[in-house]
Amino acid sequence: DGGSYQNLEEIVARAKQMVEDGADIIDVGGESTRPGSVIVDVEEELARVIPVIKKLVKEVNVPISIDTYKAEVARKAVEAGAMIINDIGGAKFDPLMPEVMAKSGAYVVLMHNRKPDLTQTDCITATSGELTEYDDIVDTVREELKESIDLVKAAGVTDDKIIIDPGIGFAKTVDKNIELMQRVSELHDLGYPILLGVSKKGSIGYLLGGLDVSNRAEGTMAATCFAVSQEIEIVRVHDVLENARAAKVMESLLNYV
C-alpha cells in the first residue's frame, strides 16, 4: 500500500482485511520502487519487513511474499516465513539472488527490468533514457525474462517454482508499457504463470487523461478485467475487494454456460 501503513498492528489489520476481501497472497515490501524513490539499505529494509512477516505468518492463512531485489533480505524473509520471493530485478540486480532463491525452496517471481547505473542515480527504477529503448517490446522482454529464468534454473530453482512478471512501469516508456499490457498473453509461450502488476500505475493514469494516483481505481479494475480475459494467473492490486469482484464477474462472463 505504498507505505500507507507504518504501525505493525495497522499492517496486520490491513492484511487480514485484504484476505477477507479476497487476496490469495500478501506481498510485503520495505523499499518503494516507484519512479523517484530512493534506495534503502539492507539493514533498514530488514528492520521494516522481518517483524511484519513474522507477525503475518501467525495471523493470516495465505502465503506471504517478500518484495525485494536484495539477496540477504530475501534469505532472511524466507527464514521468517515468506513463501515467495518477488524480485523486481529478475534475479539480476544482486549476484547472490539466484543461489538464495534456489536454497530457499521458495516460489520466485522474476520481473523484467533493467538495472540503472547506480553511480549515476540513487533510484532503482529507470523511466527514460537508453534503458527504456526497445525494438519489439514483447520479443525483448521475452528474451530478457528467459535470461532470468536461465540464471535461477542454473542455480537450482525448478520450473514449478517460477512465475514471471512483464514489469509494467519498470525501464519502459508509457507507450511501451501499454503495448506490453495489450500483448501480455504472448509471454505465456515461455511456459510459466504470469503475474501482472499495473495497479494505479502511471500508464493507467495516462489512459485516463493524466489522472493522478488517487483517481486510478476504476482504471485499475478495467486492467484487472483485461488480465482475466488474457488468462493471466496472478494480478497484484491495492484495492482487493473491488478488483476481486470485478475479476469474478469477468471470469463468470467468459465462462458462463
Pin down the residues of each PLM region:
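Catalytic domains of carbohydrate-active enzymes, especially glycoside hydrolases
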Residues: 13-29
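Active-site metal-binding loops of divalent metal-dependent hydrolases
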Residues: 23, 168, 240
